[in-house]
């Protein structure tokens, strides 16, 4: 698949993946945290999530062809037996959040235009289904840009309302009496809402498709996209979070739009923008969901179905990926003179070191009928995920959409389910898995050619290990808070 994506379109897609409807819940989190702690938590989430994206990008460069990067491929290089588990984490995360978007669409549009909740959920399929059928993430750039305009309007609305009320002197009492500038307002509330901010920057599910489709997928350009995306997302979260909290103080609600006058034309437009943003964000979650489901299906075929790699090209690609090893090795032929072997090894190393950079990958020894010595062949030119063949792309798409719409039409609240989704799925793909992959892969390129790991890579490996412990801590704390709150409600 030809790489056509620019840094601008990749930034738009990544920002739109990160920033969703949860933005309007951040002021509510600030109400419990206070201004100082809320800002610190936002910056902490930005740094840790950005580090996770950067580590994954570094891991992609350990492949001979970085355009083949995916969670699936890297897990097969490092933890083959755990690959299905991480795909399941991706499925849980994307399916759960996508489902919540459909539920919110059904709750939002009837208040704007009338009609039944279920009617609007079904009507959203007119836009969602065509966008879910595109095969390249870059083809969603225009819908992402439209979604960003909708998000920009909401952010400007929240900020301008704060400035307008401040100018009229309406906020004097709130700023003096309600706002906690330096201390935590509600410690129990902090534990209940901290996951809103921590998980706000989840966007790693679309990082690898972005890397694979970038025209210039150098580490510098990828870092540029990540830094811009995290910076823009952080700015939006802080603007909405602080402006919303400083405007309403202790009256701030979980959905900030409910704090405003529902009859105001500006608020009506804002709610319409929110609904549009939900519809346009759905395909960005569906894209990695479909890939993860395909990977799990093929793994089941191999493990329990007795599939034959020689007969099924999908199974063949999966099996080939599962046999990959991250360290390249040369193959010695006893009949070959040592000086010829040295020259061959040097030439092989040159092939594996484009532009002076070693890319880890699997090296398979193949027998050349025209040459007695072993030759090296690179395994890694397969798709960046287990490929879709024949009609599988379409029936996976159909089954997922039917199941998600059926659940959205039949159940109106997924609050508890989404709490567990955030605690497990988000932490796995944002912190734990990037940390595990980074600790295993970063620096292996230097070791493979007999060099010491550079100090910078050693630093990244330590950061990766810290990211694992950070992710596990966040996961267990989030699960504890979810169960604790549930027991209190009971």
UniProtKB/Swiss-Prot annotation:
Compositional bias of kind Polar residues: 357-368
Domain of life per record: Eukaryota
Coiled-coil parts of chain: none
Entry keyword set: Amino-acid transport, Membrane, Transmembrane, Transmembrane helix, Transport, Vacuole
Transmembrane regions: 7-27, 35-55, 85-105, 109-129, 144-164, 191-211, 222-242, 265-285, 398-418, 429-449, 464-484
UniProt cross-references to InterPro entries, sorted A to Z: AA_transpt_TM (IPR013057)
Further remarks about this protein from its record: Present with 195 molecules/cell in log phase SD medium.
Protein's name in the database: Vacuolar amino acid transporter 7
Annotated organism of origin: Saccharomyces cerevisiae (strain ATCC 204508 / S288c)
Organismal lineage: Eukaryota, Fungi, Dikarya, Ascomycota, Saccharomycotina
Gene name linked to the record: AVT7
């Amino acid at each position: 698949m030809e790489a056509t994506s620019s840094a601008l379109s990749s930034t738009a897609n990544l920002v739109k993946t990160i920033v969703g409807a949860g933005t309007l819940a951040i002021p509510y989190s600030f109400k419990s945290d206070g201004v100082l702690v809320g800002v610190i938590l936002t910056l902490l989430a930005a740094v840790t999530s950005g580090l996770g994206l950067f580590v994954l990008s570094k891991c992609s460069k350990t492949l001979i062809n970085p355009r083949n990067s995916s969670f699936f491929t890297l897990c097969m290089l490092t933890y083959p037996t755990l690959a299905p588990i991480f795909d399941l984490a991706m499925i849980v995360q994307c399916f759960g959040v996508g489902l919540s978007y459909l539920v919110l669409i059904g709750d939002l549009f009837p208040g704007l235009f009338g009609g039944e909740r279920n009617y609007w959920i079904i009507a959203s399929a007119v836009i969602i289904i065509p966008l879910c059928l595109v095969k390249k993430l870059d083809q969603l750039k225009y819908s992402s840009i439209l979604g960003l305009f909708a998000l920009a309007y909401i952010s400007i609305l929240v900020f301008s309302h704060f400035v307008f009320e401040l100018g009229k002197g309406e906020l004097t009492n709130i700023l003096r009496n309600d706002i906690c500038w330096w201390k935590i307002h509600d410690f129990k509330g902090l534990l209940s809402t901290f996951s809103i901010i921590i998980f706000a920057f989840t966007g790693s599910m679309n990082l690898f498709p972005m890397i694979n489709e970038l025209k210039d997928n150098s580490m510098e350009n990828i870092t540029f996209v990540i830094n811009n995306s995290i910076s823009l997302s952080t700015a939006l979260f802080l603007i909405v979070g602080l402006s919303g909290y400083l405007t309403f103080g202790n009256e701030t609600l979980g959905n900030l739009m409910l704090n405003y006058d529902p009859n105001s034309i500006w608020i009506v437009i804002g709610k319409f923008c929110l609904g549009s943003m939900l519809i346009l964000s759905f395909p960005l979650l569906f894209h990695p969901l479909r890939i993860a489901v395909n990977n799990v299906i093929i793994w089941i075929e191999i493990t329990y179905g007795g599939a034959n790699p020689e007969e099924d090209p999908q199974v063949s690609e999966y099996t080939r990926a599962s046999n990959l090893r991250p360290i390249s090795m040369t193959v010695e032929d006893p009949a070959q003179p040592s000086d010829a072997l040295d020259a061959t090894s040097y030439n092989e190393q040159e092939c594996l070191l484009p532009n002076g950079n070693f890319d880890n990958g699997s090296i398979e020894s193949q027998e050349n009928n025209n040459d007695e010595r072993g030759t090296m062949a690179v395994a890694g030119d397969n798709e960046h995920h287990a490929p879709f063949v024949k009609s599988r792309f379409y029936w996976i798409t159909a089954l997922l959409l039917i199941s998600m719409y059926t659940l959205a039409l039949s159940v109106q609240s997924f609050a508890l389910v989404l709490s567990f989704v955030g605690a497990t799925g988000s932490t796995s793909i944002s912190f734990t898995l990037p940390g595990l992959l980074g600790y295993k892969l970063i620096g292996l390129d230097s070791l493979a050619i007999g060099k010491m790991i550079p100090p910078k890579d050693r630093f990244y490996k330590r950061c990766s290990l810290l990211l694992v412990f950070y992710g596990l801590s966040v996961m267990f704390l989030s699960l504890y808070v979810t169960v604790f709150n549930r027991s209190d409600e009971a």
